[in-house]
Regions:
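Short glycine-/acidic-enriched loop or helix-start segments at secondary-structure transitions
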Residues: 37-40, 85-87, 109-110, 145
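Oxyanion-binding "anion nests"
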Residues: 188-195
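A glycine/threonine-rich phosphate-anchoring loop and its flanking beta-alpha core
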Residues: 92-187
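ATP/NTP phosphate-donor binding region
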Residues: 1-73
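Short beta-strand/turn micro-motifs composed of small residues
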Residues: 29-30, 78, 101
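Short Gly/Thr/Asp-enriched flexible loops that form oxyanion-binding sites at enzyme active sites
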Residues: 82-95
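Gly/Ser-rich catalytic serine loop of serine hydrolases
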Residues: 74-83
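Residue-level detector of flexible, active-site-proximal loop/helix-junction positions
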Residues: 53-56, 81, 104
């Protein structure tokens, strides 16, 4: 898994309309509200659209399996739920992934993990994938309610997940050694932000 700083994030006005022309045959994962905003901007329609309702494992897999396999790409359109769902679909279908966030206050944009939840507890990982790139279209993001783009929760969650990714990667022998003192100081800083 690459770190957030290495993600290819492309910003601009009308970037979805321009960028989607190169997608070939693709499937999309979205939510009804996000799809309503982005669908009219797409260069050509997907071969299938999976609507995300929640992050329940059986729902994610059922939607994934209902989509065609003979495509070139998976595109996640929306906020955290749909972006995470798209990661699972791309992993299960062994396809590249492009993410199109409709809000920017979510860490799902830059983290390739999809947690497996049991109630309110993470019990495992459903998918791990790095996306090819992220398209942040200013016109799309501006259509979201202001509180969804200014909440800041995504920043805090990214900070926390960065610590856990560092710990996890160090255990796997990837990246720099985990330093408990630095991690504790960073975690305290994030706690102070929330307090």
């Amino acid at each position: 898994m690459k770190p957030a700083r290495d993600y290819d994030i492309r910003y601009g006005q009308d970037i979805v309309a321009r960028g989607s022309g190169s997608w070939g045959r693709y499937v999309a994962i979205s939510t009804p509200s996000a799809w309503k905003v982005v669908e009219p901007l797409l260069d050509h329609p997907p071969e299938g659209v999976g609507m995300n309702r929640w992050l329940d494992r059986s729902h994610l897999i059922e939607v994934s399996d209902s989509l065609p396999d003979d495509v070139d790409l998976v595109v996640g359109i929306g906020a955290g739920r749909s972006l995470d769902h798209a990661k699972l679909v791309a992993t299960r279908k062994r396809l590249p992934l492009v993410q199109v966030p409709t809000v920017i206050s979510t860490g799902a944009i830059i983290h390739g993990f999809v947690a497996d939840w049991d109630g309110r507890q993470i019990v495992g990982t459903l998918a791990e994938i790095d996306c090819e790139y992220v398209l942040v279209d200013y016109g799309v993001v501006k259509q979201a309610p202001l509180h969804l783009n200014t909440a800041g929760l995504g920043d805090v969650l990214c900070g926390y997940s960065g610590i856990s990714e560092w710990r996890r990667n160090a255990r796997r022998g990837v990246g720099p050694a985990y330093d408990e003192a630095i991690a504790d100081a960073s975690e305290q800083q994030h706690k102070d932000l929330v307090a």
